[in-house]
Amino acid sequence: GIDVRVAFCFPDVYEIGMSNLGMMLLYNMFNKRPDVWCERVYSPWLDLDKLMKEQNIPLFALESQDPIRDFDFLCITLGYEMCYTNVLQTLDLSQIPLKAADRDESCPIVIGGGACAYNPEPLAAFFDLFYIGEGETVYDALFDAYKANKATGGSREEFLLKAAQIPGIYVPAFYDVTYKEDGTIASFAPNRPGVPEKVQKQLIVDMDKGYCPIEKPVVPFIKATQDRVTLEIQRGCIRGCRFCQAGMIYRPLRERDVEELKESARAMLKNSGHEEISLSSLSSSDYTHLEELVNFLIDE
């Protein structure tokens, strides 16, 4: 049976959110677990936002139409800083208290992840926890800890304490942060025992073992910004440009096996009805087997 219900939010409109590869990878991975049911949620546009507030309609998940506040987890992917106000809109429309400190046992655990989670402090008050790094590494342990805590009747705080011990998980409530006059961080220290002093980012070491390929992509019911199959061919980048955040945080470079990519491409095109495929990475021209892969895709 289903033990853990997850609402996965991309805090922007559907057309943009449906084109996000990171969200689709984790949505696919979560739903492969028989004990987890993951659904999607996006930020409504201004007209719908206004209507939902007027009619007192809480924000709901796409698949079941159940209110977000009834879920165990609300996972919000933070791709860029410009969506931070949409994060607050999502919490507000879901009728979940904006600040983590004001939430009780009936509220979902609100998780932040993605590229912006590497600088969590601007949003720390609004999240119960952040995962730092690539989501594939952390979530299985997190869901298992949640299930174990639920089975013993543990409290929200007991779960967060267990979660804080999982590598890559940052629970802002368990740390004291002080600032210098210019707004930069002066000190960062845990405020209770058993919580690590530093949170280290977690990465998939082997892309052939840790990666969960998408075989059946969800097809949008309206035109999305990227109306094609997206195939991730590698992670990280060898260039090391100083201005590039992604190049720094997704180090080191890890390539996917070319034979696996061929299988993935075949399955995704067959199961989606799309006729175009984009090869996704920070620097696709650096992929070792690019010529072989492109020739295969043209011939197929």
Question: What is the role of each PLM region?
Answer:
Residues 1-7, 14-15, 172, 178-230:
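N-terminal [4Fe-4S]-dependent radical SAM core
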Residues 6, 10-11, 17-28, 32-52, ...:
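Low-complexity, highly charged intrinsically disordered N-terminal segments
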Residues 9-11, 41, 77, 113, ...:
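Short hydrophobic segments within beta-strands
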Residues 14-17, 46-49, 82-85, 117-120, ...:
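Flexible loop/turn segments at secondary-structure boundaries
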Residues 30, 74, 128, 237, ...:
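Conserved, mostly hydrophobic/aromatic
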Residues 43-190:
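Glycine-rich beta-alpha loop elements in corrinoid/cobalamin-binding modules
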Residues 205-300:
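Radical SAM [4Fe-4S] cluster-binding motif and immediate context
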